[in-house]
């Protein structure tokens, strides 16, 4: 099947699976590597070069898609793509999106932190039809994922990356049947989660160390914020332990080299990699 692929590095294994399954990639859409929300497309650009596939960095226009359909493009596949794909008739071509939650729960650009924070039942992968509203199209296939007690953003991302290519392969292998049997999403069960910011992404030193580590794991290398000594900082890597102390939560208990130890409710938190905000 002739496919147009929209995506970034995180789902590059899906592109490789499509090629391995014999599908023809006629164009790849990605975006400049300094894009603020999705900053990893170097491998996608390299893959396009190796496959000798035309690549575009612009936002696609409706006329571009119509021209591709006229040139016999049959499927438009979106996976961690930064821009909205213009609508086109499903009678002319298939439009699919890969989403990192069990829809209809967890609509939105980045559901993984919320899944890890308080919604483990939404962990999974969904492939759905492109629709006018983001993440609202009928479901073609999905698979749930189990979370471990110490699941973090990196491990959940890895599980999703491993689960998605075979799921996509199955859909593409019998796309007409999957399309005909697609299940509309239950709007009464739907939830839309904005990109977490503010309090949701900020450590609270008055909490216990278990809660602090839980929030850190939900964001991992994408970092959480915290206030230390009156300054806002971004924290990339921490450790923590329970220990009795008499310090006020948020107090700097120790400072050495570039690391800080901060008092929490029932223990201490070691900031191993952190950066001044701004």
Residue ranges with predicted function:
Residues 231-248:
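Short, solvent-exposed recognition patches
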Residues 249-253:
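Extracellular/luminal ectodomains and secreted, surface-exposed scaffolds of diverse proteins
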Residues 1-227, 240, 254-260, 264-277:
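One-carbon transfer enzymes
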């Amino acid at each position: 099947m002739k496919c147009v692929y929209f995506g970034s590095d995180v789902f590059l294994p899906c592109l490789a699976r499509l090629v391995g399954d014999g599908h023809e990639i006629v164009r790849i859409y990605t975006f400049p590597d300094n894009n603020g929300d999705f900053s990893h497309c170097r491998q996608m650009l390299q893959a396009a070069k190796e496959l000798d596939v035309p690549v575009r960095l612009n936002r696609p226009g409706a006329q571009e898609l119509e021209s591709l359909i006229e040139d016999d493009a049959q499927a438009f596949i979106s996976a961690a793509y930064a821009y909205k794909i213009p609508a086109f008739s499903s009678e002319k071509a298939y439009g699919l999106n890969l989403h990192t939650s069990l829809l209809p729960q967890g609509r939105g650009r980045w559901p993984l932190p919320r899944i890890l924070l308080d919604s483990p039942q939404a962990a999974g992968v969904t492939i759905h039809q492109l629709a006018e509203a983001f993440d609202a199209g009928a479901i073609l296939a999905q698979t749930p994922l189990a979370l471990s007690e110490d699941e973090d953003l990196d491990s959940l991302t890895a599980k999703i990356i491993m689960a998605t290519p075979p799921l996509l392969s199955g859909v593409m292998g019998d796309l007409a049947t999957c399309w005909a049997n697609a299940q509309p999403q239950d709007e009464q069960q739907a939830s839309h989660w904005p990109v977490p910011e503010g309090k949701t992404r900020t450590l609270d030193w008055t909490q216990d160390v278990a809660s602090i580590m839980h929030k850190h794991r939900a964001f991992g290398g994408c970092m959480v914020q915290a206030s230390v000594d009156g300054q806002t900082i971004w924290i990339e890597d921490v450790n923590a332990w329970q220990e009795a102390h008499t310090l006020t939560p948020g107090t700097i208990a120790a400072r050495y080299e570039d690391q800080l130890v901060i008092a929490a409710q029932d223990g201490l938190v070691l900031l191993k990699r952190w950066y001044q905000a701004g």
